[in-house]
A protein has these predicted regions:
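Conserved beta-strand signature within the Rossmann-like core of class I S-adenosyl-L-methionine
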Residues: 148-155
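A short acidic, Gly/Pro-enriched loop at the edge of an enzyme's catalytic core
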Residues: 111-122
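Conserved alpha-helix/loop element of class I SAM-dependent methyltransferases that forms part
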Residues: 33-49
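A short SAM/SAH-binding and catalytic strip from SAM-dependent methyltransferases
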Residues: 120-132
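Class I SAM-dependent methyltransferase SAM/SAH-binding core
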Residues: 54, 60-112
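Class I SAM-dependent methyltransferase Rossmann-like catalytic core
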Residues: 18-35
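N-terminal, positively charged/glycine-rich alpha-helical extensions of SAM-dependent methyltransferases
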Residues: 1-22
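A short glycine-rich, Lys/Arg-flanked "PGG" loop and its adjoining helix->strand segment in the class I
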Residues: 135-147
Length: 183
């Protein structure tokens, strides 16, 4: 394998910390994804009307927009990302879907969410492997969750193997989060 191809494969699949570029997320939001990651099936058990939900690293709204429908007119979805382009694309999609009144976009710092709103549910789908300091990240999540709040963590198997995921879960537990269930 030539050197350039090896570098590309390492960049795409090796388990390092990098932020998925905004322009790449168009490939994630397609009709096939719903076969594997159906937002309604995955999230409905945890979301009540009127809830305040935090979607961290929301991409272009694949989960945020269905979450906004689930929380209803009295609920809120805070979509937090480090890339302004991602948040702009999400906002346009939220307007097109008619859920902009439930949606709050929030630009994070690379080392902090920068939020102080208490939330009922936090979603971190395929993004914790991009976080520079998972310990501080989980501490911040714990501080934002209501006492009865829930946190759903999912990582991509191509970037995070089982041992790495178990380490991530242990880090989350060391920050006061409790493992409730696994798929």
């Amino acid at each position: 394998m030539d050197h350039q191809m090896k570098n590309l494969l390492e960049r795409l699949f090796v388990r390092d910390q990098h932020v998925c570029p905004w322009w790449c997320c168009f490939t994630f939001d397609n009709f096939l994804r719903k076969l594997f990651h159906n937002p309604e099936k995955i999230l409905r058990p945890y979301i009540l009307k009127g809830s305040t939900v935090l979607d961290i690293g929301p991409g272009m709204g694949y989960f945020s927009i269905p979450l906004a429908r689930m929380v209803g007119e009295t609920g809120k979805v805070i979509a937090a990302d480090v890339q302004p382009e991602m948040l702009r694309a999400l906002w346009m999609r939220a307007k097109k879907a008619g859920v902009e009144h439930q949606m709050i976009t929030h630009l994070c710092k690379t080392d902090s969410l920068g939020l102080n709103t208490q939330v009922d549910f936090v979603l971190a789908f395929w993004m914790v492997h991009e976080v520079p300091n998972p310990f501080l990240f989980f501490k911040e999540i714990r501080s934002l969750l209501q006492l009865s709040g829930k946190f759903l963590l999912s990582e991509p198997i191509l970037h995070v193997n089982q041992a790495m995921f178990e380490k991530t879960v242990k880090t989350a537990e060391s920050c006061g989060l409790t493992l409730m269930e696994k798929p």
